Amino acid sequence: MRKTVFLHFVPKYLLSFALSLLAVYSSAENISSRLTVDMTTDKACYIPGQSVVFVLSGNVPANTMVRYRHGSAILETHKLSEVMSNNKWSWTPPMADYQGYLVEVYTETTNQSTILGTIAVDVSSDWKRFPRYGFVADFDNAGGSIDKNANIKSEMAYLNRLHINGVQFQDWQWMHHKPVKLDAHGSLIPWYQDISNRWVGVEYVKNYIAEQHKYGMKSIFYNLCFGAWKNAVNDGVKTDWALLKKDGSGNFYQDYHGLPSSWASNIYLQVPGNMDWQQYMAERNTEIYSHFDFDGFQIDQLGYRGDVYDARHKVVDLPASYKSFIQAMKSAHPDKDLIMNAVSGYGADNIVSSDVDFCYNEVWGNGNGYGGVSEADFANLLGIIQANDKYSDHQRQTVFAAYINYDKADNGGSGDKMVNTPGVLLTDAVIAALGGSHLEMGDHMLTREYFPAAPLAMSDALKTAMVRYYDFQTAYQNFLRGTTSKAAYLPVVSTSSNYSVNAWPPKSYSITTFAKKVGNCDVLHFLNFLNTDDLSWRDVWGTRTFPDKYTGIPITVTANRKIDKVWAASPDSHAGAVQELAFTQKGDDVSFVLPSLEFWTMVVMEGSNDEDHVYITGEAVQLDGHAAYDLAYAVPMTNKGEGKVFKVTTYLKANELFKFTNGRDWRYCKSYCAEYKDYQFNSFVSLAHITTLGEDFKFMVPEAGYYDITIDLEKMRVYLTKADLSGLSAIIADKSPSGEFASWYSVSGVPVDKPRKGIYVRNGRKVLF
């Protein structure tokens, strides 16, 4: 027989109602587009309080309007003629930081808006919150035959139109171990040759930086963390810093990255964790920052190198060395940004958990000889984002260096020598829908790991499409990247059409869906794989074809809550403008018509708080005689009007598993799981992230007892500590004063039929059961 412990307590009894959702109907907004207007902004991103200056080109009717949106919400609307003078006007966004906006120029009749043009605005005080990374890699004027400074202005104007907020300078330096070339007096030498014998003009490096800073972009220089040219000993590099390998006979030699014989040198590797090497490179970086106005350092590596050793023939842990190198660079220049490449994921856990500003993954089809596993499929990209989120404690964004049309580019730009537009757009659609970003844009589109190479050209149509796609990922950045992968889930979606619909990962000849919970919104992505069985993002030979564009697809989504509004937007339609959709809701089913699908359409369902209940289930709370995951006996958590925060004090068995759900029916409810298998709370670990996507990993505690458990579904976190029961005194009470068995309630006043170990209220007193 269990003893019950009471403490006098007068609860505020709450009456709860279980209301089934009635049918809800909503009408649609009619929208069309006639994209005759182009716009630019004076910066790629803005800090809160800055005004945005727009310049418009193209003819507009007299009744043209302009409106500013955050998501579907319209913040302001004006007659364009009242705010614009000489094709220019300004707008000051709200003061909120890290927000994306879409500006729509349109005309309107009684029943329809016609979009003439759109442009995005990013208000972010720090670019690392929503990085959109570009590159530059050419600093020559071809012997004076081209106007390089004019090219710099036009190239950066285009990157500004794409809202690129950070630019990587590839192959800008002189020698890897001595990037800045100085004369005997310590002054910059105006011209030098890089490792491939290309000429680099210091003037042009500086002018790129100045032009980028004008637009609010960050300028990041590139270098290896462990590279030196031949004869580097003449510049102070010590032989005992060398990274060594061992041949088949057991002889040690310095590891190196071989390059063509026509180039200036191979690259000879040093131990990145060697403190003397770190000091040497920190001094070189001081020279860089003293002569160039760079904002940070893009650190590179070469992936898995096999077994490697230091000068004393001790094994070197390269990933640990990378982390040490990053920390040394940050200590030397704490105000500068740092990014490091995780080549095929090598060393990612050490890199991402160190002091980098965001995650940067160079992905390959087969590890590219670097020892990595294949990352060629679209499905791999989500796994990389999830891993980065875990390694960074969900603090850092992911940028992919993913080279499109690689084999076509590597074979001299075979065929038409053009980048394949549908290959680019589907890859960019998937990366953005998953919450990532794609390093691809510079003075050309990146198709190879050697950034100066430009074997494939962009068509004008692709350049325009890039504007649409970068506008889209900037305007809707809060819906795409405002939460991490722990807020992702696999939506339950069906269609009455003949088209196949499946939840992530992509499936041949199907519409693939992916979703995230963002605030009070379910953000659903529809990705078009209906016309293809090619599930690789690489499109290596540039053979992907344009998909058919589908319209009027009937969709039904299981929502589990009351939906107030449904809207759609696509970079492929109406320049990304919002289109409100008619919908019906019957019970848990929300039905609407997807207006169009070419590569990618995003649908957002706005509604009330969907988490009215949260329960704990599993072996750790299992009742005798009942299955561990019988939701009828799950432990209910209570919400005291604290938004999406639920709490309970309950008994947990030692070393047994548990997780959380938002319902009592496995057919419809959502599970909130751990990110790691058998995640253990203890006296040192009281916080964990939860996720609704991926493996069904669960939590445990090492010691049986009563625990205070809090789950926050806004932050997607769970907090767990041992309960303090010192204030409770033991009083046995089985019946109420009237002699009848008293009813049980949770602490917040919810009736409980079957009390279990935990704190409840009975007969006006708090009970430890």
Regions inferred by a protein language model and the residue ranges of each:
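Active-site-adjacent "subsite" loops/lids of carbohydrate-active enzymes
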Residues: 131, 137-148, 221, 225-292
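C-terminal beta-strand-rich structural cap/linker in extracellular carbohydrate-active enzymes
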Residues: 586-609, 707-717
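Aromatic-rich carbohydrate-binding modules that target alpha-glucans
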Residues: 609-654, 663-688
